[in-house]
């Protein structure tokens, strides 16, 4: 099976989704032929065991579309997995893949939680919902939630009920167990 993961940024400063991609690719490459597509950055993380492609950014709309379609034609993936919301590039990556007949999984990474939706609702979220985000969620072949609570919140939106829960993993390889425990008696006061 061939899988393409799209993530808007692999830069170290991008936080959680970038760290998630590093952990995911480490394990997923054991099971599938994996490709990651993103946009160039000054300080990208290292993604091992898969091929990483960088395509033009959204501001170079036609270049981004051309490169993405070329990659889809060359790689012929079984699944395209889009990681992120609230960025037009993510919605267009999904739209172009589905226009060519590819199945798309959308992972919002908690970005559709009620508290995120409420933040800057009138100035950012509502326009994005009107222009691209609602359609992207509705048309995704599968939504990937990382917890039951995320699934419940996605269902409350009413946009798409094709939701699967797959929890994020934890890499315990480099965690050392403490060999000795010192017992401290402390009083904690909360007011």
Regions found by a protein language model. Give the residues of each.
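Acidic anion/phosphate-binding donor-loop and adjacent secondary structure
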Residues: 155, 165-184
């Amino acid at each position: 099976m061939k899988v393409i993961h799209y993530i808007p940024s692999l830069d170290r400063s991008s936080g959680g989704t970038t760290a998630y991609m590093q952990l995911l690719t480490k394990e997923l490459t054991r099971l599938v032929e994996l490709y990651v597509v993103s946009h160039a950055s000054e300080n990208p993380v290292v993604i091992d065991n898969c091929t990483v492609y960088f395509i033009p950014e959204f501001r170079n709309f036609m270049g981004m579309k051309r490169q993405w379609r070329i990659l889809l034609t060359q790689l012929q993936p079984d699944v395209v997995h889009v990681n992120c919301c609230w960025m037009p590039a993510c919605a267009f990556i999904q739209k172009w893949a589905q226009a060519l007949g590819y199945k798309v999984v959308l992972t919002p990474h908690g970005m559709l939680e009620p508290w995120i939706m409420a933040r800057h609702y009138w100035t950012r979220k509502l326009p994005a919902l009107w222009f691209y985000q609602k359609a992207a969620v509705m048309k995704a072949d599968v939504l990937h939630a990382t917890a039951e609570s995320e699934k419940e919140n996605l269902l409350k939106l009413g946009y798409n009920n094709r939701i699967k829960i797959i929890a994020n993993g934890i890499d315990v390889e480099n965690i050392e167990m403490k060999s000795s425990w010192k017992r401290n008696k402390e009083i904690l006061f909360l007011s």
